[in-house]
From Swiss-Prot:
Residues 34-110 bind DNA. It holds the Pfam family zf-C4. Orphan nuclear receptor. This is Nuclear hormone receptor family member nhr-130. It comes from Caenorhabditis elegans. GO terms for molecular function: DNA-binding transcription factor activity; RNA polymerase II cis-regulatory region sequence-specific DNA binding; zinc ion binding. CDD domains: NR_DBD_HNF4A. Its main location: nucleus. GO terms for cellular component: nucleus. Belongs to the nuclear hormone receptor family. Residues 184-439 form the NR LBD domain. The gene is nhr-130. Keywords: DNA-binding, Metal-binding, Nucleus, Receptor, Transcription, Transcription regulation, Zinc, Zinc-finger. It is found in: Nucleus.
Length: 440
């Protein structure tokens, strides 16, 4: 919140137009004003380069003006929020804002002694008696010696015994049984890719003629566990239609399933949403969770209480909004691409097996690379012999760009998830935590 003040009232911030001696002479008239940064609206530190700003924006402006890279690009038509979800979103809009509020590169000072980053506020009794006010309080960040986004991470808030335990043994046993039994229906296809594409339509389990879609307004523990079970078993059923996968040792099958199920579902839900929007099954602002359930990421109520003791407002650094988690930025290119069942199946395989190979390396990497090589040959045969499209490089590039968006999002979220584990913000434990690695 920014408090407006009269232009004639003195400020606690030092400005170049007022000398320290003049400030001392007028100390009797000193009025404490609360300021926010004119760039990002966070608490300000002082007058930097001609504008009231925080230290972060001042340092950013100095780097932007003196660094080698001074040209930035905006992805949202130069209309971004400077501070959103615990981070600075757009460098271009932030630099434009710095210039708008009057920051001047001509005020930079070079070749001078460093100034200590420690703030020293007058706290003597004479000072308080003279100015008729109590000592200016230290910030919580300064007092605890922690950045603002982890000041709430005090380990005494809850003990280890208060953590919720989720036993996934029964779910893994069900998936293991499915893999041992093999595919539910025998399918005859020319190659693995075509058979997986046929299996994809079977495991989606959409009743014929059913168009009833339920709007999900709340996503809590019960809903999350239900979706996890459905998604995990769906991927297990789908992999039973992959003949090369069925030849692997059972322990490797389970290992791959536990690592790729959530990656598979991210792309599949995006594809389902793109198809549903084209067919007017859901609205343009809605996201499909399953074939018969949909949510509005702007209005859905997310219940965090079952896996953390901290309020949602304090977790904005660690967790994205629903639409960011679903990576809606990949929806537009996916909608424009309109992949066929064969193409979507290849995208799912490439995304999952590339991720698993990168994650485990070694023998798993060799297995997944062989899978990708064989499936790429099948895709080539599909383009050349069925679609009569020998020049398919452009379309393949579009498919891989969408997969790369998802992979990049996974890598970016990994660092935040590691921080969350270090500071122990979760009050939940899984019997098989490897299943939720990189789930974000």
């Amino acid at each position: 919140m920014q408090i407006a003040t009269s232009s004639t009232s003195p400020s606690i911030f030092y400005t170049p137009s007022i000398s320290p001696m003049e400030e001392d002479m007028n100390c009797q008239e000193l009025v404490v004003n609360l300021y926010t940064c004119q760039v990002c609206a966070l608490p300000a530190h002082g007058n930097h380069f001609g504008a009231i700003s925080c230290r972060a924006c001042a340092a950013f402006f100095r780097r932007a003006c003196t660094g080698t890279k001074t040209t930035y690009k905006c992805k949202k038509q130069n209309n971004c929020d400077i501070w959103e979800n615990g981070r600075y979103k757009c460098k271009k809009c932030r630099l434009d804002r710095c210039n708008e509020v009057g920051m001047d590169p001509g005020r930079f000072q070079f070749d001078r002694d460093l100034i200590s980053a420690t703030e020293k506020y007058p706290n003597s009794k004479n000072f308080r008696r003279t100015f008729g006010m109590s000592r200016l309080p230290e910030t919580i960040e300064h007092f605890l010696g922690r950045p603002h986004f982890i000041i709430f991470l005090e380990r005494h808030i809850y003990s280890h015994s208060e953590k919720n335990f989720v036993d996934l043994q029964h779910l893994i046993a069900k998936a293991s049984k499915l893999l041992e039994l093999g595919s539910e229906k025998p399918l005859i296809a020319r190659n693995n890719l075509e058979k997986l594409a046929l299996g994809l339509n079977l495991v989606r389990d959409q009743p014929a003629g059913s168009h009833d879609v339920q709007l999900v307004t709340k996503l809590g523990k019960d809903e999350a566990l239900t979706f996890w079970e459905t998604d995990f078993l769906t991927v297990a059923k789908w992999l039973t239609y992959f003949d090369d996968f069925q030849l692997l040792p059972h322990n490797q099958q389970i290992l791959l399933l536990k690592s790729v199920w959530h990656v598979w579902n991210r792309l599949e839900k995006l594809a389902l949403t793109a198809t549903s929007r084209r067919q007017n099954v859901c609205e343009q602002k809605q996201l499909m969770l399953t074939y018969n359930s949909v949510c509005n990421p702007k209005t859905i109520e997310l219940d965090y209480s079952w896996f953390t003791k901290y309020p949602k407002e304090q977790l904005c650094f660690f967790f994205d909004e629903m639409e960011d988690y679903m990576l809606t930025s990949a929806l537009d290119p996916l909608t424009s691409l309109e992949p066929t069942d064969i193409e979507l199946t290849y995208m799912l395989c490439q995304l999952c097996f590339h991720y698993a190979g990168k994650r485990y390396g070694g023998e798993i990497l060799e297995v997944t690379e062989k899978f990708q090589e064989n499936l790429a040959d099948n895709l080539h045969d599909y383009y050349v012999n069925e679609l009569n499209m020998p020049r398919y490089c452009g379309r393949l590039n579009q498919m891989l760009k969408i997969n790369n968006l998802i992979q990049q999002d996974i890598w970016e979220k990994r660092a935040k998830h590691e921080l969350a584990k270090v500071f122990d913000i979760f009050c939940i434990e899984f019997s098989h935590p490897e299943m939720f690695e990189d789930t974000g």
